[in-house]
Regions:
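FAD-binding core/adjacent interface of flavoenzyme oxidoreductases
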Residues: 2-14, 82-190, 254, 265
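C-terminal auxiliary extensions adjacent to catalytic cores
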Residues: 12, 362-417
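FAD-site-proximal beta/loop scaffold in flavoenzymes
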Residues: 128-156, 260-323, 333
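Internal hydrophobic alpha-helix adjacent to the cofactor/substrate pocket in enzyme cavities
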Residues: 184, 321-347, 353
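A Rossmann-like FAD-binding core segment of flavoenzymes
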Residues: 38, 81-91, 95-98, 106, ...
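Glycine-rich, N-terminal phosphate-binding loop of Rossmann-like dinucleotide-binding domains
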Residues: 21, 102, 115-116, 164, ...
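Flavin (FAD/FMN) cofactor-binding core of flavoprotein oxidoreductases
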Residues: 205, 344-361
């Protein structure tokens, strides 16, 4: 691995430029280099640390060590990749250039867009000032997940609010996972009957794949949690411990409703990063436009995208990335070789719903909510096996498989010959 940080007048040229050093960027680079070690690939990533984000929900429930979710970026960067320690500011697909925040430009033959998404904390008035204090927390941040667990342990009664913004978000099940693990702890500590639990969802369904809703509702009822649909968090007054929601009323209008809290778990609105939304690569919603099956850009065939920033309507999860990596690697190399694209993405994503400590509903599904279970078991049933996968095997698979280009259980569908 080489690293570059200095500015230069003329663009440095690479076979492939990858924007983003998250799961998608590191994983697809590793897979490409396993296939063709001679490729000259640059990864544009300013961060010095790499996080295993799927475990932060477990951290917030006291079931995982926060220190085991982070490693130095240098330790996960593929050896033969060129690490560009900078941020991508602009993409010029006409000129095949990526412009960086340090004044440099990188030229590419192929571009992979995977910078993730942006957590828009600022969209909720007063939130940024009170995060990490006054009982306000979020498992969507490395430094706050341990605070979630602290609040859960300390709460002996009162009101606990959990929120979920409008879609799309990273792991649509994560907001309710925080609720379930908190309630499970309170139940075991015999204080759940003293805690008023409310789940405020901007949307109108508990989970987007209907087959899993009955199983989840059993836990909502077990924990005596109330559901407030059409209720979107818009401001937080941490000092007064008041959360304000924009709530849809029966007439279709929107009213402001103030709710007091003792604990507030917030999931922020999530948006495409400006480097994508401000580019000609973006669709109308701001995500990097792709063909949903091939993950190639429909107007710029030198460009591929995967992960949270791409427009494919799949669940934005690491499990989706694991499958997308293989599709992009195979199709990008085929495009270099001027061959038909061989791999098709079926929209696979997975959301291990931690309904209680020790049991998980392993929701695996593709486009249109089609169930795509890995195991020949009823996927809607909570299982201890799925908990062990979530808390033990999947973290190991992430660090030792996905980030290393090892494509276990990730073979894509093939395009018709």
């Amino acid at each position: 691995m080489s690293t570059t940080a200095a500015a230069s007048d003329s663009p440095e040229t690479f076979d492939i430029v990858v924007i983003g050093g998250g799961a998608a960027g590191i994983g697809v680079t590793a897979s490409l280099l396993r296939r063709r070690p001679g490729l000259r690939i640059a990864i544009v990533e300013p961060a010095e640390r790499h996080f295993y984000q799927p475990a932060w929900t477990l951290v917030g429930g006291g079931a995982f060590n926060i220190g085991d979710t982070v490693r130095p970026m240098s330790s996960v960067m593929p050896e033969r990749a060129h690490w560009i320690r900078a941020s991508a500011n602009a993409i010029d697909p006409e000129q095949h250039l990526v412009r960086l925040d340090n004044g440099r430009a990188l030229a590419y033959q192929r571009l992979i867009v995977c910078p993730g998404l942006r957590l828009a904390w600022e969209k909720i008035e007063g939130l940024e000032e009170t995060l990490g204090k006054n009982g306000v927390t979020s498992n969507y941040r490395f430094d706050l997940a341990p605070y979630t667990w602290q609040l859960v342990r300390e709460l002996k009664g009162g009101k606990a609010l959990f929120t979920q913004p409008g879609m799309p978000i990273k792991c649509a099940g994560a907001p309710q996972k925080a609720l379930y693990l908190s309630c499970d702890y309170w139940r075991k500590q015999h204080v759940l009957d003293k805690v008023e639990v409310e789940f405020n969802l901007a949307g109108d369904v508990l989970f987007g794949v209907a087959a899993f809703v009955p199983s989840l509702m059993k836990y909502v009822e077990r924990y005596q949690a109330s559901l407030a649909f059409g209720s979107n968090l818009i401001s937080v007054d941490g000092a007064r411990k008041i959360a304000t929601f924009a709530v849809k009323d029966a007439a279709g209008g929107v009213v402001r409703v103030e709710k007091p809290f003792d604990m507030l778990h917030v999931v922020p609105p999530q948006l495409p990063p400006p480097v994508v939304s401000n580019s000609v690569l973006a669709d109308k919603a701001g995500w990097c436009e792709v063909d949903h099956a091939t993950l190639m850009h429909p107007r710029y065939p030198e460009v591929f995208a995967l992960g949270d920033a791409c427009s494919a309507p799949n669940a934005k999860t690491a499990a989706a990335v694991r499958k997308q990596i293989v599709v992009v690697a195979e199709n990008l190399l085929a495009s270099i070789d001027a061959k038909p694209l061989p791999a098709l993405y079926d929209g696979y994503g997975a959301c291990p719903l931690t309904v209680e400590r020790g049991k998980v509903v392993l929701a695996e599904f593709g486009y249109g909510g089609k169930l795509l279970p890995t195991f020949p078991l009823d996927p809607t049933v909570p299982r201890a096996l799925a908990w062990h996968l979530k808390s033990g095997f999947l973290p190991w698979l992430y660090w030792n498989g996905l980030l290393k280009g090892r494509e276990w259980l990730a073979a894509p569908a093939k395009a018709p010959a």
